[in-house]
């Protein structure tokens, strides 16, 4: 009887040891499996994180390039307007009208016309590449820049600054006197705007249409950031027209047209070289 009890106890002890060993083996396998699953989840999270990081880096690079393109277009259009509009026909129109009419009205009319012209020119510059390939538009812009640059340098070399300035002022005065008798246009729109505002707007708009600054604005907008070109050109027109209205003909007479033409010619030639050696992608 005692032997049977001992045998039974021994079997129970062996069963307990076997169960404990099996449990220990299961516990060792579970952490490994859990580790594998955790590693897989970690790998997936790492890949997702790396993908998001690369995407954010790409977005940051794109934003950086867009910012540089905006600044480049802004500076190019601003400098182009400053060197081409000072002493130009629109500059003299604003200066002469400000001598006889309220400066604020003349300034608002001239700036309104120039802003409208800038928007139209920038829009044309963005439409043209959709009709013509960027390669051809860039080539045309290069030729236009070179043409205007050489033309300005030729004007600076051949013209007498005082004589040419006096002649241009006389031509503008003749246009202003010729427009005094045409009151039908003023009467029609007098309910909406004052006659002085309309006169300043119409004369500035017609003088700017087809001018070298308008063509240069169109050329800039074909291969540079349109917003930067529009903002830079608008700021340049605002500065030049404000100087014309405040200073009048005194400011225009003190600025050497030969110097302005030389600076403008060199700037346009610089644009031409930049467009030729660094074409848009």
Curated annotation (Swiss-Prot):
<dbReference type="GO" id="GO:0016020">
    <property type="term" value="C:membrane"/>
</dbReference>
<feature type="transmembrane region" description="Helical">
    <location>
        <begin position="226"/>
        <end position="246"/>
    </location>
</feature>
<protein>
    <recommendedName>
        <fullName>GDT1-like protein 4</fullName>
    </recommendedName>
</protein>
<dbReference type="GO" id="GO:0005384">
    <property type="term" value="F:manganese ion transmembrane transporter activity"/>
</dbReference>
<feature type="transmembrane region" description="Helical">
    <location>
        <begin position="66"/>
        <end position="86"/>
    </location>
</feature>
<keyword id="KW-0732">Signal</keyword>
<dbReference type="Pfam" id="PF01169">
    <property type="entry name" value="GDT1"/>
</dbReference>
<dbReference type="GO" id="GO:0005794">
    <property type="term" value="C:Golgi apparatus"/>
</dbReference>
<keyword id="KW-1133">Transmembrane helix</keyword>
<dbReference type="InterPro" id="IPR001727">
    <property type="entry name" value="GDT1-like"/>
</dbReference>
<comment type="similarity">
    <text>Belongs to the GDT1 family.</text>
</comment>
<dbReference type="GO" id="GO:0032468">
    <property type="term" value="P:Golgi calcium ion homeostasis"/>
</dbReference>
<keyword id="KW-0812">Transmembrane</keyword>
<keyword id="KW-0472">Membrane</keyword>
<feature type="transmembrane region" description="Helical">
    <location>
        <begin position="105"/>
        <end position="125"/>
    </location>
</feature>
<dbReference type="GO" id="GO:0032472">
    <property type="term" value="P:Golgi calcium ion transport"/>
</dbReference>
<feature type="signal peptide">
    <location>
        <begin position="1"/>
        <end position="22"/>
    </location>
</feature>
<feature type="transmembrane region" description="Helical">
    <location>
        <begin position="258"/>
        <end position="278"/>
    </location>
</feature>
<feature type="transmembrane region" description="Helical">
    <location>
        <begin position="188"/>
        <end position="208"/>
    </location>
</feature>
<feature type="transmembrane region" description="Helical">
    <location>
        <begin position="137"/>
        <end position="157"/>
    </location>
</feature>
<dbReference type="GO" id="GO:0015085">
    <property type="term" value="F:calcium ion transmembrane transporter activity"/>
</dbReference>
